[in-house]
């Protein structure tokens, strides 16, 4: 386990295809490093059975989400798989001002938007070992239709092609090794 201290007040952007294991990695990371702050996104999608409102996401209606966009309350937002996702601006700004290291897990389009506002943020891309393994993981979740899985896999190919845009790429083929690589990326001094 890496024990170095991250740079105060920094933003870490984590992106990767749906089903790549971002959530699992972040849960493990937070257990090891409770000092890290996790940005909570807003979404219009319904909660999954294990998700907690206000902890995993702020679950809002499409109308509420559009009002947040109109009021400039979102740092970034995107539509993905038929639902809206976005990052409420004010909590993120407050956490960074308090010197916290904030982890922001978002989709590719959102990561590109954040780079415009926070060019100094560290951008990390989580890759699957292969598309076949990604498909296996998506099917194992048992929550998507065949059509949704096909859509997510097609989107994954586009996202994977963008991985070189990111400061660090981590192939999530072994949880512990991936977690160590993620810790190294977060806690190492910026180049």
UniProtKB/Swiss-Prot annotation:
One annotated Gene Ontology cellular component of this protein: cytosol
Guanylate kinase-like domain span: 9-187
SUPFAM superfamilies in alphabetical order: P-loop containing nucleoside triphosphate hydrolases
Database matches in Pfam families: Guanylate_kin
EC class of the enzyme, as a word: transferase
Catalysis: reaction(s): GMP + ATP = GDP + ADP
Designated name of the protein: Guanylate kinase
Source species: Thermosynechococcus vestitus (strain NIES-2133 / IAM M-273 / BP-1)
